Amino acid sequence: MKRIHAFLFSSLVVILSIVMVGCKDTGKTLTSATGSIYECLVVMNNQALTQDELNAVAHKSLVNEASGYSEPISTTYDLVKAVMAADMPAMPQMEPYFKLTQVNMTYFDDILKPTRNILFVDIDPNKYTQLKVKVANNNWSKPQAVCRIQSPSQEEFVAYWLEKGEGIREWFVNQELKRQTQFYKASTNKDARTILQAQGYDMLIPEDYIIILDTLLGGATTYSLRQPATVASNTRVLWCCNNKGPMRRDIVIYSYPYTNPKTFTAEFLNEKRDAVVSRLVHGSVDGSFMGTEYKVMPPQMRTILVQDSAQAYEIRGLWRIQHGEAMGGPYVSHTRLDHVNGRVVTAETFIYAAGQKKRNALRQAEAILYTLQLPEDK
């Protein structure tokens, strides 16, 4: 079986097309970072865009339904905001990637230095002769992510941001995901981990998740299902849930033999998801079950890198209860090929939080998916 070649989708590769210098943690004692997850401080002097720059922005089509941003763009900060605060894809309500706060360079002081995520945009022809991007962790606090864009002209910055801004945003997202996975290392469900390790896998499922269904080890162990769950004979499933508080979070890991060359297509993976979750998740109305929303917001698939260099297929979409009550929410899945055992492995998280914002909860659960290790990762 040929190994799937990793498609370098990683945002870091995108950013590295411009000179980038990464700064390591100095090891010194640092204060705790301030601010909440997925908040970012933008430090820059806001300037009006020229007509040529406005034309370039219009050509890029940053402001439209597909881009997830609808506010007018007339200044350099507007341009940054159009990318950093664009709406996340496949969410039931509009929620931005990041909540932003902007201050001018002269107002950045010791009070603001511990901020969790900081993006500097410094445009100065007297200091710089070429555009550079520098990233660092834990400059003034911990955990902290800092990105500096240094440009000799506004024109060069605008051109760079239009091409690479999404890569900068993805770098900040990745920093948040990494912080969350570090937290999970100290708090894991040992029983779930033992079940996965028996299959040659590993995953940091938090200890506040309970096991609902396990067919990974053969047979079926059901813990707390309202209705019986069934799975295909060649499919193995581990289903865990955190139902504490007003929000429910679920993790489902399932695997099946790799026999179809069309496996890693959106059509195949979506059909496989429906086949699995419709048998697992039922509503309170007899005959109701979980399905995927295709009409209002079709699932979106892309290739990502996990475990440093392994290829995974990410799908974001909306789930809903079919033939039952009005229930639904967002989900994210990662699918990979287990080369050692010749199986396809999918790890998915879906959440239910009626009337609540879901970005942070989904991102926290999504971080669990990034901890999945297959035999070839070890």
Locate predicted features.
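Bacterial signal peptide processing site
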Residues: 24-27
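Short, well-ordered beta-strand elements
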Residues: 144-153, 249-256, 342-352
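Surface-exposed amphipathic alpha-helical segments
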Residues: 156-182, 342-378
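C-terminal motif of bacterial Sec signal peptides marking the signal peptidase cleavage site
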Residues: 18-22
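Secretory pathway targeting signatures of secreted, lumenal, and periplasmic proteins
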Residues: 41-43, 59-68, 208-282
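Signature of long, low-cysteine stretches enriched in small and polar/charged residues
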Residues: 93-149, 155, 277-341
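Long, folded non-catalytic interaction modules
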Residues: 33-164, 169
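Bacterial N-terminal signal peptides that target proteins for export
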Residues: 1-11
